[in-house]
C-alpha cells in the first residue's frame, strides 16, 4: 500500500494524495512509518480479480475495497468477495482515518438496489457485505435505502446471507428500526477507536451513540447478529481496548474485529505504532474471555475480511451456545 500516490482502481490511473480530501489540505503532513514485514501484501494480479472489477464497473457499483484503499483487495477480489458501498462515493463526514472522499453527495440512485442485487446473484455469493457512506444530508441517514438494498438482494439471491455495515444514524430517529425491520443477518457498526481518541479520529461521531445503536438493534431483533470493529495503533492502550470490549458486551454484541490502522495519505492521522501479531492474539484471547461469540483479530483484519467464513463460524457458535443452554 502506497502513501503519497494512491492507485485509483476505478479508472486505472492515479491521483495525487489530498484531492479527495480538501478539508485536510490545511493540515501539515504526518510522516509515514515503514510497514513491518507482517503488513505487506501482494499487488492484485489474479484473473478473477479483474473479472470482479469488470462486474463492479458494469453494474456501476462503488466498493469500499477501492474507496478505503483496503490492503486486502487483491486477496478478496480474487475470490469474488467485494464489499459494496452504497449511497454514493462521497461521505458527509471527514474522519481523520478514512480514505473515502468527503464532500456534498449526489441524490440517491433509485436503481442502485437492483444493481447491487444483480451483482450479488452473478457473483454467486454465499455471504455479502454491504456498507455505505455517512449521509447526514438525508432525513433518515439513508436507512430506507439500506433496507431497500437488503430486500432486493433477498429477492435476487435468497440463499445469500446479508451483512450490513452502517453509519451511526446520529440524530436520525427511526433509522435503526427501519434497517432492523429489513432483517439483515448481521448488523455491523464500527466503534473504530477508543472514546478518548474520538475528537481527533472520529470527530463527527459520538462513542455512546454508536454503542446505543448496536444495543438498539439487538433489542429490536435478538436474532440479528451484531458486530463491531476497532482499529488499533492509533495511540490507545490495552486497558482502553478492554473497556471498549466490556461496553460492547453490555450491548450484547456478538462479534468483534480488531485490525491495524494504516495511514492512507500524509494528511490523515499518523500511525502511532504497529501492533505485533502476538498482541493481536492477546486481544483475541481477551475478547473470547469476555464472551464474544466470534473474534477476528490480526494486523490485516478488516470488517469484511473473510466475512463469509466468519459468518459460518458465528452461526455455528450461536447454535453451540443454544445447545448448551438447552
From Swiss-Prot:
Positions with a binding annotation for [4Fe-4S] cluster 2: 91, 95, 98
Catalytic reactions of this protein: [[Fe-S] cluster scaffold protein carrying a second [4Fe-4S](2+) cluster] + N(6)-octanoyl-L-lysyl-[protein] + 2 oxidized [2Fe-2S]-[ferredoxin] + 2 S-adenosyl-L-methionine + 4 H(+) = [[Fe-S] cluster scaffold protein] + N(6)-[(R)-dihydrolipoyl]-L-lysyl-[protein] + 4 Fe(3+) + 2 hydrogen sulfide + 2 5'-deoxyadenosine + 2 L-methionine + 2 reduced [2Fe-2S]-[ferredoxin]
UniProt-listed Enzyme Commission number(s): 2.8.1.8
Pathway: Protein modification; protein lipoylation via endogenous pathway; protein N(6)-(lipoyl)lysine from octanoyl-[acyl-carrier-protein]: step 2/2
Keyword Metal-binding assigned: yes
Cofactor note: Binds 2 [4Fe-4S] clusters per subunit. One cluster is coordinated with 3 cysteines and an exchangeable S-adenosyl-L-methionine.
Transmembrane segments: none
Alphabetized GO MF terms: 4 iron, 4 sulfur cluster binding; lipoate synthase activity; metal ion binding
Alphabetized InterPro entries for the sequence: Aldolase_TIM, Elp3/MiaA/NifB-like_rSAM, Lipoyl_synth, rSAM
Start and end residues of each stretch annotated as Disordered: 1-37
Top EC category: transferase
Residues that, per the record, bind [4Fe-4S] cluster 1: 65, 70, 76, 304
Residue stretches making up the Radical SAM core domain: 77-293
Subcellular location, record wording: Cytoplasm
Listed GO CC annotations: cytoplasm
Keywords of the record: 4Fe-4S, Cytoplasm, Iron, Iron-sulfur, Metal-binding, S-adenosyl-L-methionine, Transferase
Biased composition (Basic and acidic residues): 1-29
PANTHER family: LIPOYL SYNTHASE, LIPOYL SYNTHASE, MITOCHONDRIAL
The protein's name in its UniProt record: Lipoyl synthase
Name of the coding gene: lipA
Amino acid at each position: 500500500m502506497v502513501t503519497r500516490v494512491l492507485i485509483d482502481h476505478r479508472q486505472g490511473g492515479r491521483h495525487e494524495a489530498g484531492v479527495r480530501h480538501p478539508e485536510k489540505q490545511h493540515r501539515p503532513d504526518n510522516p509515514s512509518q515503514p510497514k513491518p514485514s507482517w503488513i505487506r501484501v501482494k499487488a492484485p494480479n489474479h484473473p478473477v480479480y479483474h473479472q470482479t472489477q469488470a462486474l463492479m464497473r458494469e453494474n456501476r457499483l462503488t466498493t469500499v475495497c477501492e474507496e478505503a484503499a483496503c490492503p486486502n483487495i487483491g486477496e478478496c477480489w480474487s475470490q469474488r468477495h467485494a464489499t459494496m458501498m452504497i449511497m454514493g462515493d462521497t461521505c458527509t463526514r471527514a474522519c481523520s482515518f478514512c480514505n473515502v472522499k468527503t464532500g456534498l453527495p449526489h441524490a440517491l440512485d433509485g436503481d442502485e438496489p437492483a444493481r447491487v442485487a444483480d451483482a450479488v446473484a452473478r457473483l454467486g455469493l454465499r455471504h455479502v457485505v454491504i456498507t455505505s457512506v455517512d449521509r447526514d444530508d438525508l432525513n433518515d441517514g439513508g436507512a430506507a435505502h439500506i433496507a431497500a438494498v437488503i430486500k432486493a438482494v433477498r429477492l435476487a439471491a435468497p440463499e445469500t446471507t446479508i451483512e450490513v455495515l452502517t453509519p451511526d444514524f446520529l440524530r436520525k430517529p427511526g433509522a435503526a428500526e427501519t434497517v432492523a425491520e429489513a432483517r439483515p443477518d448481521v448488523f455491523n457498526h464500527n466503534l473504530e477507536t477508543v472514546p478518548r481518541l474520538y475528537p481527533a479520529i472520529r470527530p463527527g461521531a459520538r462513542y455512546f451513540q454508536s454503542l446505543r445503536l448496536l444495543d438498539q438493534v439487538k433489542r429490536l431483533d435478538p436474532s440479528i447478529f451484531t458486530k463491531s470493529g476497532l482499529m488499533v495503533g492509533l495511540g490507545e492502550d490495552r486497558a482502553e481496548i478492554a473497556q471498549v470490549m466490556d461496553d460492547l458486551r453490555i450491548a450484547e454484541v456478538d462479534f468483534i474485529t480488531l485490525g491495524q490502522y494504516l495511514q492512507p495519505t500524509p494528511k490523515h492521522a499518523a500511525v502511532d505504532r504497529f501492533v505485533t501479531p502476538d498482541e493481536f492474539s492477546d486481544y483475541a484471547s481477551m475478547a473470547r474471555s469476555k464472551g464474544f461469540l466470534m473474534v477476528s483479530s490480526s494486523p490485516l483484519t478488516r470488517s469484511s475480511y473473510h466475512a463469509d467464513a466468519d459468518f459460518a463460524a458465528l452461526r455455528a457458535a450461536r447454535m453451540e451456545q443454544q445447545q448448551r443452554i438447552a
